[in-house]
């Protein structure tokens, strides 16, 4: 029964000290940036009913959810996604729209063993709800670019795709659901040979404009030249409108001076089926995994109430932290500047002194040792060069100068002691 008591479950890990501080700093900087841009905060439970994620389109595989039972035997899950619970809140609470919300929290998904992915990750994100024009997508992309800039993330790019274009192609060519799943993997992985074989095996007419567009889809990534190429092959108004939307978003963001942070990839297809239009993925060149993901989901909120258009972007905090650790100087934990050793009857005075010194920007801690020599040893081990002793009758300051020497003594009040 104690076999696993010293181990972590697959896909999880412990975060210690400096890394914890960095995670917290990233979350708080993202939060501040989003709040400054007018987003309002929403928090949802870590656990949700299974039914929240089990509507008809099944956007998240059941096998990827951590499931258990509540006291009444109902199926509960650790949330595998942040957007769906937010859709539940907006749909059931009848929030006034348009609405801009931000969130941060842990997401849990059971990935395959040895896949190199964590099953528990931290996400911070934004959603713009109730707006169906391109201003919603533009707002989301600008917000995320500015937040990554403030975090000093280097060499990142956000790719803009269009799942509606892919869905139009699939519909026009009458590709069945099971075949579509296979086709999707070929396009996403840019497997040109397998895609060509798929077209041949399906006996699709390679002279047909839609088939030409399908075959070119994995190659349609880059800048506005990609849009021009896709427009030539678009065979329906719906396809043309989908392509034009990507063009409008790209041009608007480029005019703001953020062109170096964006690119187009019309062969990008999100794995979550609730996306209905423009989609996004962000990467840092040095890191393979995505740091940003999201898109438009105009039909999701309707599963919980009124049908409302919406766009969202999620930032993968763990990946941002990993990038910052690689791109920047090693994070140095702020050491304790002063340690206060006190006799129990001088606790109040010691705490007052700690508060006074802290207001000057010092990191000050009360010693946990009853013996002064133990406090000295701890201070040396942790590179603390100043120890203040709160004795029964006075305060004494010691400084390390190859040995502990008295710097000042004699004061009984922490206020006058600090001023000396």
Curated annotation (Swiss-Prot):
Cysteines paired by S-S bonds: none
Location, primary (coarse class): cytoplasm
Any Gene Ontology CC annotation: cytoplasm
The protein's annotated pathway: Amino-acid biosynthesis; L-histidine biosynthesis; L-histidine from 5-phospho-alpha-D-ribose 1-diphosphate: step 1/9
Family matches, as InterPro entries: aa-tRNA-synth_II, aa-tRNA-synth_II/BPL/LPL, HisRS-like_core, HisRS/HisZ, HisZ
Gene Ontology MF annotations: catalytic activity, acting on a protein; histidine-tRNA ligase activity; transferase activity
The entry's keywords: Amino-acid biosynthesis, Cytoplasm, Histidine biosynthesis
Location of this chain's protein in the cell: Cytoplasm
Pfam families: tRNA-synt_His
GO biological process: one example: L-histidine biosynthetic process
Gene3D superfamilies xref list: Bira Bifunctional Protein, Domain 2
SUPFAM superfamilies: Class II aaRS and biotin synthetases
Domain of life: Bacteria
PROSITE patterns assigned to the protein according to its UniProt record, in alphabetical order: AA_TRNA_LIGASE_II
Something else known: This function is generally fulfilled by the C-terminal part of HisG, which is missing in some bacteria such as this one.
Quaternary structure annotation from Swiss-Prot or TrEMBL: Heteromultimer composed of HisG and HisZ subunits.
Protein family (similarity comment): Belongs to the class-II aminoacyl-tRNA synthetase family. HisZ subfamily.
Protein role: Required for the first step of histidine biosynthesis. May allow the feedback regulation of ATP phosphoribosyltransferase activity by histidine.
Record protein name field: ATP phosphoribosyltransferase regulatory subunit
UniProt organism field: Bacillus thuringiensis (strain Al Hakam)
